[in-house]
Amino acid sequence: EDTMKLRTVGLGLAAAGAIALGGAALAQNVPEQFVVSGKAAEKIQDFTTINLATAERIANSCEKAATAEGVQISVMVLDNDGNHVYMDRMDGQGYLNIITADMKARTALMNRSPSKLVMNRVIEDPTRELQQMQLGQFANSGGLPIVVNKQLIGAVGVGGSAPHPPVWSDEICAHKALTEVIGPSVPPLEKDLPPRANPTPGEAPVPRFVAATPPKTTLPADFVVGGKGAGNVFDGNQISLAAAKRVARVCRDWAASKDGTMSLYIIDNAGEFVHMERMDGQVYNNIHTAMLKAQTSLKTRQPTSVANAQLKNNPNGIARTTTYFNLFTNSGGIPIVVDGQMIGAIGVGGGAGGGDENCAIEGLKATFGDHVTLPVYPAAGGSPRG
């Protein structure tokens, strides 16, 4: 019996060693410049998932290419578990552009292949689209898997620009970005199939819907979407991508200075994603709560710390309210109110080393200065806020 126990222990140690060696091999297979590494990778038990730096470079490269073409895009980068890692919505983009970027990335991730292949299958046989939809796949080009040294580390999806292949398309934008960031190992694009012609086209008149004058705003131009972008969404008071990225950068640096990490979402005043990022070592709960905080602060028009304090001071009715109306009461969500005008909301999750709300405040102060409204707590010994 003792011999059997020793043999079992020996086999267990051998298996553990094999797992450790396997993890080390995976870690060595993908250069650290592209994936979460070190203690952050040990924390999430994954040495093969895309890091924030790579995701940010891919998004920025795609946006630069789109700007050169005179178009706007939305770009979403996922890790190999399907979590959001980095997201940007260029000014003037709307809901459909944003959500399809996410859908394309998820389709590429699920199939480990370009989302165009799903589109091509549907073009060849339209009866297959229902099955693809039932599987949660989106039959459109613009989603590509992110593969380094034959290891899937994530996926990217781009939406929002009118396709004009072979000159320009969402997929071309994503491919250019991957080639610039990952290198020449990125495979060439799949062939484009011509769309199937409608045998019985209709002749219904299509109305135009264009405002005669661009929307007006009293806010500084640096803070909000302007020009043609504002005209596209009929709103001159949406937070701009540039302002959102400044807020996020300060929050990220502040968290790092506290030896912490965070996940962050910034949404516009319609509740649509503008910018998102997940620092290395963050997991699903951190990411998802950041989104919930931003959405809650937008819906309630107040920081999530208000309900958090109320829950501690007098919980009567709070559970009912939060459940019925899908609110989240942890601190870290703040509506972005500039010169009295709400232009969006921010949500921070994951701790940030010194508190999620504090991280959000640092980003807002650095970006908007005295223009922004921030939560103010009573002095020690004063009446607690209701």
Summary of predicted features, one role per range:
Residues 4-27:
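Gram-negative bacterial Sec-dependent N-terminal signal peptides
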Residues 28-386:
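Flexible, solvent-exposed loop/hinge segments and secondary-structure transition points
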